[in-house]
Amino acid sequence: MARTTFLVSVSLFVSAVLARTVEYGLKISDGEIAPDGVKRNATLVNGGYPGPLIFANKGDTLKVKVQNKLTNPEMYRTTSIHWHGLLQHRNADDDGPSFVTQCPIVPRESYTYTIPLDDQTGTYWYHSHLSSQYVDGLRGPLVIYDPKDPHRRLYDVDDEKTVLIIGDWYHESSKAILASGNITRQRPVSATINGKGRFDPDNTPANPDTLYTLKVKRGKRYRLRVINSSEIASFRFSVEGHKVTVIAADGVSTKPYQVDAFDILAGQRIDCVVEANQEPDTYWINAPLTNVPNKTAQALLVYEEDRRPYHPPKGPYRKWSVSEAIIKYWNHKHKHGRGLLSGHGGLKARMIEGSHHLHSRSVVKRQNETTTVVMDESKLVPLEYPGAACGSKPADLVLDLTFGLNFATGHWMINGIPYESPKIPTLLKILTDEDGVTESDFTKEEHTVILPKNKCIEFNIKGNSGIPITHPVHLHGHTWDVVQFGNNPPNYVNPPRRDVVGSTDAGVRIQFKTDNPGPWFLHCHIDWHLEEGFAMVFAEAPEAVKGGPKSVAVDSQWEGLCGKYDNWLKSNPGQL
């Protein structure tokens, strides 16, 4: 995970007198790689997977020039980048989702994202937000350091080596998987940590050539920034023989919480401290998939004091048996819809019915977990400004968001509507409106709901699909307070604060304040489900987007994106 060259020098832990502009360059290209030992064509960032670590300090401004060098017609050739978790105050034009806040960047063109970081700190990531493109490799870590980190006394080491970006992996392109209409091909074949993994762990040695290796010194404490950059996979993360102390979730510092392991869904981030307090040896960093059978991401933790030649860990790496509910999900005979995020209209989903019958004998038997302390997400207490967004008062506006699956078409829906990308980006529609933005300005398929400004909003997110899987739901432009999980008692005093929350059919209730005008995408972070319609847009205070102290001011390069994209479509009809 090589770091790009800074154009402006940044001191990580020395408080700056003035905020700086930190510049990066990302070249998006096609190339052949084999992160798990099997070669495939992928979408690369600066020639690699994952992309380089982007980092800066609290208060800095990021300027990231993205150059599109994509040429392979069997892959997506246009692109856009989303900066997951960054709030983008007055900056919705650089949030990144194609056809929501911008038109895509076409081949042989570039676009520079300028992002004031303001008071945000923590662990984030960036990824393509064009159809399912990030599945093919366009993803990387992003960290905003706090020179006055309130947890600084808890760790000794926090650098690029302790950033762990985990991701599921496929041996065929996402475009081909979507075109097949076969749900069984949505199952990842392996998983990686910092771009290394083993497709066939039983016949591939575990060593620093095949697995990411973190070297530690006995007695030191390491801040691990764990990022789940997966398309669908959720993981249970642990370090063999060591406890971990959770200190942040989704960029929000939390009260320290010591556990043996924690679950992390697609899009989520967990910061934890591990103390190197065991006998010098080699230990597994384990991340078995909890929603896909018989797959595990691994890395190695090696004590520098162990002077012996390299040797693998003594014990087997942790395996995990998926629940019967997950087996039921992969056994469901439902069609797989596609084509809803094209942005150019006219695509009709060609769907093939698919099912995968998993015999119980093929699933690893569940290990005895009675002595393992696993993080309870409901116990994540924000370190600063705890409390629900609405306080003890009722929300100003309560919206029920019920997700479900149309088994006939294979499309996921929210409140009965599968989202489909518009031809004109939502933000552009808002900015060019002359007579007051209303919901009638958007088609039913765009599924855009207007939120009033400076109000406390409550979403009741629940499902009626009957499919027992946890959906990682993400809202751009905000963090939210999770005041209730399922039928558990609500918590308005110190609820968890995140930007991705897992929801089953039983549901969750979340609260946030509409203090950030812009069109913000809400969607399932299982990218197949997003592509199949599990999304909608909240146009927050649209009149304030057009004018006033919180307005979004676009520049000429942003204004030129759609014209370039329209011209590209003329010679590449029906493509992305």
UniProtKB/Swiss-Prot annotation:
Subcellular localization(s) per the UniProt record: Secreted
SUPFAM superfamilies recorded for this chain? Cupredoxins
Q: Which residues bind Cu cation 3?
A: 129, 476, 523
A molecular-function term among this protein's GO annotations? hydroquinone:oxygen oxidoreductase activity
Which example biological process does GO assign this protein? lignin catabolic process
Tell me which InterPro entries the record gives: Cu-oxidase-like_N, Cu-oxidase_2nd, Cu-oxidase_C, Cu-oxidase_fam, Cu_oxidase_CS, Cupredoxin
Comment on pH dependence: Optimum pH is 6.
Q: Which domain of life is it from?
A: Eukaryota
The prosthetic group or cofactor this protein requires is: Cu cation
Ranges of residues in domain Plastocyanin-like: 21-145, 157-304, 376-576
- Give the range the annotation lists for the signal sequence: 1-19
Disulfide bond entries: 103-562
**EC no.?**
1.10.3.2
**Binding positions for Cu cation 4 per the UniProt entry:** 471, 524, 529
Let me know which tissues express this protein, per UniProt: In mycelia, at a lower level than LCC4.
Where is Cu cation 1 annotated to bind? 82, 474
Q: Which UniProt keywords apply?
A: Copper, Disulfide bond, Glycoprotein, Lignin degradation, Metal-binding, Oxidoreductase, Repeat, Secreted, Signal
Q: Which reaction does it catalyse?
A: 4 hydroquinone + O2 = 4 benzosemiquinone + 2 H2O
Question: What family classification does the UniProt entry report for this protein?
Answer: Belongs to the multicopper oxidase family.
Describe the protein's quaternary organization and the partners it interacts with. Answer: Homodimer.
Q: Which PANTHER family match?
A: LACCASE, MULTI-COPPER OXIDASE
Its protein name is Laccase-1
Q: Give the organism, scientific name.
A: Thanatephorus cucumeris
